[in-house]
Amino acid sequence: MMLPSVIAPPAMYPSFLRPSSALSLPPALQSAFTTHSSFLVEDLLRISRPAAFMHRSIPSPSASPPATGVTTLNTTSSAVHVAMSTALAKRSSSPQTSISSDPNYLKFGVNAILASTTRNASPPPPVQGMNAKTFPFPCFDGSFHPFIRASYFPASSSAVPIPGTFAWPLTARGKPRRGMLRRAVFSDVQRKALEKMFQKQKYISKPDRKKLATKLGLKDSQVKIWFQNRRMKWRNSKERELLSSGGCREQTLPTKMNPNPDLSDVGKRFEHEAVLRESPRAPFCQSRGDHEFNADLHFKSPSISSKHSDFSESEDEEITVS
């Protein structure tokens, strides 16, 4: 049951439902406004939609008869559709000379613009054939903005496909960074062989280093790093010994005159130096200065110490690695 107050327009605000006389509307629409003006769905659809969308199916005879007001609205809407279609056909068939022959005709007036759009207008496509509105760029794509995080959008959402990780921080920027080397763990046999070679020569050459690495089953870089660390420990201990005996740190560093310093007998050399100062040559050495005397001992000591070390190591058994 339909209420009569809904069908009939209210008496207080008739101007809201009827168009003003200043607007130029087709006669079919004017008749529609004058006959039935209300907020019904039928009237709103009839005004907003073109005639192609307003075709309605005829109810079957087996169905229940509709109400009287609904039947009147259906017949009125069909009459309005027929009137609109005939008006459009007459306007399209009329020549342009009839419009342009009018003395009040303006080339860029409202009537001319509306007439041109009416002539060039094509029938609207069906709703099924209309495509969705596309954007010039994909919204919320992975490459749209790098700072969109997946925490703002659920990963299960199909409307907003956000990748789990972004590819831009994983791109290679030049050479890959070299990782830190793991600390090598040497066995007792390897450590003894390395220590024996270090007692022979503090600065091992490349061929000897490669032979030793192959013999011990190590890498060349591992042997090189072991010798560097061992020389640092040896130099620190000798510095403390030299400083306690009155020497200097420069005696432990390699120079052009002595590229391979060997200070394994620092204590013995300083004892020998004290004996020479107490000998009859002491006044002469004092007159020449202690610097020259120490330098002379510094240059002569490597040969003596190397002979002593070769003699002492010849008695030891050679360490072999299986």
UniProtKB/Swiss-Prot annotation:
DNA-binding region coordinates: 179-238
Gene3D superfamilies the record matches: Homeodomain-like
Extent of Acidic residues compositional bias: 312-322
Native source organism of the sequence: Danio rerio (Zebrafish)
Family affiliation: Belongs to the H2.0 homeobox family.
Matches recorded under InterPro entries: H2.0_Homeobox_NeuralPatt (IPR051662), HD (IPR001356), HD_metazoa (IPR020479), Homeobox_CS (IPR017970), Homeodomain-like_sf (IPR009057), HTH_motif (IPR000047)
Superkingdom field: Eukaryota
Cellular localisation: Nucleus
Pfam families, per database record: Homeodomain (PF00046)
Protein name as catalogued: Homeobox protein DBX1-B
Transmembrane annotation, as ranges: none
Keywords annotated in UniProt: Developmental protein, DNA-binding, Homeobox, Nucleus
